[in-house]
Amino acid sequence: MARWRPDMAEREATPEALYLRRRDFLALGAAGAVGLLLPRGARAGDPTGAALQVARKVDQAGGETPTPWDSVTGYNNFYELGTSKEDPSRNAGSLRARPWTVTIAGEVKRPQTLDVDALVRMFPPEERVYRMRCVEAWSMVIPWVGFPLADLVRRLEPTSRAKYVAFQTLLDRDQLPGQRRPVLPWPYVEALRIDEANHPLALLAVGLYGRVLPGQNGAPLRLVVPWKYGFKGAKSIVRITFLADRPHTTWNDAAPDEYGFYANVNPEVDHPRWSQARERRIGEFFRRKTLPFNGYAAEVAPLYAGLDLRKNY
């Protein structure tokens, strides 16, 4: 597949310096909207963590303003670190992101175990500004740092039997204390069809806002699929498995009427308990219309030609 070429110029992505100058206003907006609590000792808008070198910066969010750092890192769903939105940032210190390896298995010609730092050396990361839409009807705009999942897939040489790719989160009740409670069947597993995994927009993220990925955001390696609801983005990945048959996935198994396997953002298919037609952007007061495929329909809709998206939600 041809490598994705964004039509947005690099200068349209918001520089971190500009973001820092307006952080007070935006942070107050986010806090008022969602009651955001900052991690203890943190100040609004102070990015932390080691800086990452990026090969290029591109905007695939239509020039929308990125959500402030303190909101992106302080308002999270990561049940392995707790079920409230503030738990992940409070508990992230227990997650040890180095050393870290990822096991590649299944229907590939080159199964192997890779160190996450070796992955970064193999595939120089780039910054991509993406919209993120949660199934809970809130959204953000996040400048991720990572590399195309398709680059890794090609290097691994899937066999002709490989139709799906599954991503498994770390299972460690000491590092991820939320796993001590049977909130979900652990470990967390998500999956994509092989053609979705090969789409140029699918990203394996190792950072955000030019910094290494914080624990609460899925350090050191997480999946980002911007046209799908956020729960498809497996965090703290330790295993990637190529499969002939569709695997079981965590939320789809736990509540299939509420969380579909495809989980494509679709304003015409409501969650059983709320509408998906509108969303609240973190930091904004009024709701906005939700876009089909989260605004990426032109790029990804052909993947689902002929598929009934109401039944295959």
UniProtKB/Swiss-Prot annotation:
One cellular component term from this protein's GO annotations in UniProt: periplasmic space
Compartments, as annotated in UniProt: Periplasm
Main localization of the protein described in the UniProt heading: periplasm
Reaction(s) the record says it catalyses: L-methionyl-[protein] + a quinone + H2O = L-methionyl-(S)-S-oxide-[protein] + a quinol; L-methionyl-[protein] + a quinone + H2O = L-methionyl-(R)-S-oxide-[protein] + a quinol
Keyword Cytoplasm: no
Binding site for Mo-molybdopterin: 76, 79-80, 134, 169, 217, 222, 233-235
Record keyword Zinc-finger present: no
EC number(s) reported in the record: 1.8.5.-
Cofactor annotation: Mo-molybdopterin
BP GO annotations: protein repair
GO molecular function ontology, one term from the record: molybdopterin cofactor binding
UniProt-listed Gene3D superfamilies: Oxidoreductase, molybdopterin-binding domain
Record PTM: Predicted to be exported by the Tat system. The position of the signal peptide cleavage has not been experimentally proven.
Pfam families (alphabetical): Oxidored_molyb
PROSITE patterns: TAT
Signal sequence residues: 1-44
Keywords associated with the record: Metal-binding, Molybdenum, Oxidoreductase, Periplasm, Signal
Cofactor mode of binding and number, as noted: Binds 1 Mo-molybdopterin (Mo-MPT) cofactor per subunit.
Database matches in InterPro entries: MsrP, OxRdtase_Mopterin-bd_dom, OxRdtase_Mopterin-bd_sf, TAT_signal
Assembly and oligomerization: Heterodimer of a catalytic subunit (MsrP) and a heme-binding subunit (MsrQ).
General function of this protein: Part of the MsrPQ system that repairs oxidized periplasmic proteins containing methionine sulfoxide residues (Met-O), using respiratory chain electrons. Thus protects these proteins from oxidative-stress damage caused by reactive species of oxygen and chlorine generated by the host defense mechanisms. MsrPQ is essential for the maintenance of envelope integrity under bleach stress, rescuing a wide series of structurally unrelated periplasmic proteins from methionine oxidation.
Classification via NCBIfam families: PRK05363.1
HAMAP family listed in its UniProt record: MsrP (MF_01206)
Similarity annotation: Belongs to the MsrP family.
Protein name according to UniProt: Protein-methionine-sulfoxide reductase catalytic subunit MsrP
Organism phylogeny: Bacteria, Pseudomonadati, Myxococcota, Myxococcia, Myxococcales
Gene: msrP
